[in-house]
């Protein structure tokens, strides 16, 4: 019987996470069929998608940073209960575009709320469920934001309006987490050409699929 596998993807703005995921999920769907479940945060179900619309408005809604952290955590809890856990209980392979490390990096680091504080509220939400592997696509802030500006199609969200300092804190926190939890969090150099980033990420995914088979 196949074993359940939970993989999350992380990265700062402009790391190319969406492009890498689209390419690899297409490949994996062909290989794994219904055994593969893909989802995203915040989102994945009606409640979490409703929270997403509050968290990612077209205009700044003046949201308090602690409110933001709690809403992301609430969306994560519903996502876990409604999407991730049921799939893992059926021995599926779950790939999530973002998970708890996003909150640690963006709210804990970027917003300055502290990793420990964000981890505490998320422990209550995730009930100990961490990914078997987290793939972190790393890119320097200047390169990432330049990519965002180049590829923007008229839409600007709240994160696009944040300062360089905010994004630097996000990346620094991601790198700190990767250093502390290197057994779980694997880093991929996202400054490379897209095809090379996809290749490096594919190797990591194939490795865990083989290890868990």
Swiss-Prot record:
This is Thymidylate kinase. CDD domains: TMPK. GO terms for cellular component: cytosol. It catalyses: dTMP + ATP = dTDP + ADP. GO terms for biological process: dTDP biosynthetic process; dTTP biosynthetic process; dUDP biosynthetic process. ATP binds at residues 11-18. It holds the Pfam family Thymidylate_kin. The gene is tmk. It comes from Leuconostoc mesenteroides subsp. mesenteroides (strain ATCC 8293 / DSM 20343 / BCRC 11652 / CCM 1803 / JCM 6124 / NCDO 523 / NBRC 100496 / NCIMB 8023 / NCTC 12954 / NRRL B-1118 / 37Y). Belongs to the thymidylate kinase family. Phosphorylation of dTMP to form dTDP in both de novo and salvage pathways of dTTP synthesis. The keyword Calcium does not apply. Keywords: ATP-binding, Kinase, Nucleotide biosynthesis, Nucleotide-binding, Transferase. It is an enzyme of class 2 (transferase). InterPro entries: P-loop_NTPase, Thymidylate_kin-like_dom, Thymidylate_kin_CS, Thymidylate_kinase. It comes from the Bacteria. One of its GO terms (molecular function) is dTMP kinase activity. Its EC number is 2.7.4.9. Gene3D superfamilies: P-loop containing nucleotide triphosphate hydrolases.
């Amino acid at each position: 019987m196949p074993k359940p596998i939970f993989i999350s993807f992380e990265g700062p703005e402009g790391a190319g996470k969406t492009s890498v995921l689209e390419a690899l999920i297409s490949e994996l769907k062909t290989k794994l069929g219904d055994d593969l479940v893909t989802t995203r945060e915040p989102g994945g179900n009606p409640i979490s998608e409703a929270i997403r619309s509050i968290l990612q408005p077209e205009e700044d809604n003046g949201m308090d940073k602690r409110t933001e952290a709690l809403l992301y955590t609430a969306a994560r809890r519903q996502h876990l209960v409604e999407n991730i856990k049921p799939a893992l209980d059926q021995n599926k392979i779950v790939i999530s575009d973002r998970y708890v490390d996003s909150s640690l990096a963006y709210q804990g680091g970027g917003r300055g709320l502290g990793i420990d504080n964000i981890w505490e509220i998320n422990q209550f939400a995730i009930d100990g469920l961490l990914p078997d592997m987290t793939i972190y696509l790393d890119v320097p802030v200047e390169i990432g934001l330049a990519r965002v500006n180049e590829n923007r199609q008229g839409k600007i969200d709240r994160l696009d309006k944040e300062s360089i300092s905010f994004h630097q804190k996000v990346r620094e926190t991601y790198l700190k987490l990767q250093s502390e939890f290197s057994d779980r969090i694997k880093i991929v150099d996202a400054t490379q050409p897209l095809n090379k980033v996809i290749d490096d990420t594919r190797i990591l995914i194939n490795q865990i699929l083989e290890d868990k088979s």
